[in-house]
């Protein structure tokens, strides 16, 4: 029920007393303060944006050190190829896969909205993703799709090439699909050390794609930024990510403020959005509902299927029953 002024005043008094007692330590005695086995002091100004890579998820790299770390990972031959390469052609250090994936984004709308705002600003400025970058967006649920559409941001992600390809595991587990044939051939022919940047949680060599040696884990907004740059050997804090008609654009030109992000979150994130989508979670779309199935408690094997066959060894055992001895 809606509360009246008297009830509201009582609630505010209760909140004030409890907040004062439990949060503001200076107003409490030593006996009131909780004792912990370990106390960690953290200087918030020491926190830096970072990514992980190029081979393991635990290998954290500060954003300002990504370029240096990648260059140090190259052997002498790869370094020579990179030095001789043209910045506008496929070579070592170029990003061939950029994906906003489901595993680390569904419960964090703020970073997805940030990614959408970056895409919007890039489209409005005329910044495009280089041709060698394959892009995709795989939300963890349809809730994400709906609030990105409500925010008017999905259309800008689409224009950059970050179209929704599915819901759930995709590029992060190696389900990216093939690279463009011409790109694959050049990577193999020249033995290039190309990269992927995904917002997943695993980046072991060969896991994302067999032709991609260096893989980096980053937040969704950084995935968009790196895709626009098209290469990993860049200092995003200082180097331009694109030049249009002689004008240089930097990450700071695209990065949204917390105020921008909060304004959109307050507008589109509503409880009913989640209730509606999870209520319909087992219904599926029209393609799912059109599938003809037999009403049975066990799987109905099809003799015409070339994909799933009934294991023959189960039938063999059924026809050759043996007694169990000394079990």
Segments the model singles out, each with a brief description of its role:
Residues 1-327:
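Fe-S-dependent hydro-lyases/dehydratases of central metabolism
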């Amino acid at each position: 029920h809606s509360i009246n002024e008297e009830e509201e005043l009582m609630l505010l008094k209760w909140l004030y007393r409890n907040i004062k007692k439990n949060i503001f330590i200076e107003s409490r005695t030593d006996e009131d303060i909780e004792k912990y086995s370990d106390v960690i002091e953290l200087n918030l100004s020491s926190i830096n944006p970072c990514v992980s890579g190029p081979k393991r998820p635990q290998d954290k790299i500060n954003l300002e050190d990504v370029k240096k770390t990648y260059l140090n990972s190259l052997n002498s031959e790869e370094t020579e190829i990179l030095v001789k390469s043209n910045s506008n052609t496929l070579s070592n250090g170029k990003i061939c896969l950029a994906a906003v994936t489901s595993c680390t984004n569904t419960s964090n709308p703020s970073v997805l909205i940030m990614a959408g705002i970056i895409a919007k600003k890039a489209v409005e400025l005329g910044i495009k993703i280089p041709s060698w970058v394959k892009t995709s967006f795989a939300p963890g649920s349809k809730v994400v799709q709906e609030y990105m559409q409500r925010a008017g941001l999905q259309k800008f992600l689409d224009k950059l090439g970050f179209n929704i390809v599915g819901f759930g595991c995709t590029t992060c587990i190696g389900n990216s699909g093939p690279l463009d044939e011409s790109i694959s051939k050049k990577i193999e022919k020249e033995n290039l050390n190309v990269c992927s940047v995904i917002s997943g949680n695993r980046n072991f060599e060969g896991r994302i794609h067999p032709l991609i040696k260096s893989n980096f884990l980053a937040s969704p907004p950084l995935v968009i930024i790196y895709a626009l740059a098209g290469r990993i050997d860049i200092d995003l804090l200082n180097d331009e990510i694109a030049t249009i008609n002689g004008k240089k654009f930097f990450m700071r030109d695209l990065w949204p403020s917390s105020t921008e992000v909060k304004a959109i979150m307050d507008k589109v994130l509503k409880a009913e959005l989640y209730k509606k989508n999870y209520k319909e979670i087992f219904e599926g779309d029209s393609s799912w509902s059109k599938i003809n199935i037999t009403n049975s408690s066990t799987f109905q094997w099809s003799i015409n299927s070339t994909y799933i066959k009934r294991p023959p060894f189960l039938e063999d055992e059924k026809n050759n029953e043996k007694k169990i001895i000394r079990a």
